[in-house]
Amino acid sequence: CYICHSLKYDRIYSNKNSLCYVFLIWTLTLIAIMPNLQTGTLQYDPRIYSCTFTQSVSSAYTIALVVFHFVVPMIIVTFCYLRIWILVLQVRRRVKPDSKPKLKPQDFRNFVTMFVVFVLFALCWAPLNFIGLIVASDPATMAPRIPEWLFVASYY
């Protein structure tokens, strides 16, 4: 990231590399959708008026999906933010002013803004993923016990 590796940022995120990253993200997205087509977990859900992932079709697949598409990314992003925060604290506590480049106020504001976006993203997606884990634990028993309003609210 820019805050931790500001000298390498321009090289890592050049226009050419950024296009490669976008292509990679779209490719990984298409690959991630393929198992849904194999397991039959994409179905129309009249509660949300949309074709969506059906959590009760396969418990193992639902758990894997939640772990690899929500839990692991949250852990990675949290680790990265912890590294950034440690750097921010080190820069603020530094006694020698010229030993390393200082953190600019704009960089700190950008960090806080990105962190707030991350927290809001996690808060928005957590209910749906936790409901998925609950349903996956015992689909026949738990799926009917999830209130419909809670399920619908977790999508929005």
UniProtKB/Swiss-Prot annotation:
InterPro entries: GPCR_Rhodpsn, GPCR_Rhodpsn_7TM, Mel_1A/1B_rcpt, Melatonin_rcpt. GO terms for cellular component: neuronal cell body; plasma membrane; receptor complex. It is a multi-pass membrane protein. One of its GO terms (biological process) is camera-type eye development. The chain crosses the membrane at residues 19-39, 62-82, 115-135. It is found in: Cell membrane. Keywords: Cell membrane, G-protein coupled receptor, Membrane, Receptor, Transducer, Transmembrane, Transmembrane helix. Pfam families: 7tm_1. Its main location: membrane. It comes from the Eukaryota. GO terms for molecular function: hormone binding; melatonin receptor activity. At least in the brain, more precisely in the pars tuberalis and the suprachiasmatic nucleus. Belongs to the G-protein coupled receptor 1 family. High affinity receptor for melatonin. Likely to mediate the reproductive and circadian actions of melatonin. The activity of this receptor is mediated by pertussis toxin sensitive G proteins that inhibit adenylate cyclase activity. Possibly involved in sleep induction, by melatonin activation of the potassium channel KCNMA1/BK and the dissociation of G-beta and G-gamma subunits, thereby decreasing synaptic transmission. This is Melatonin receptor type 1A. The gene is Mtnr1a.
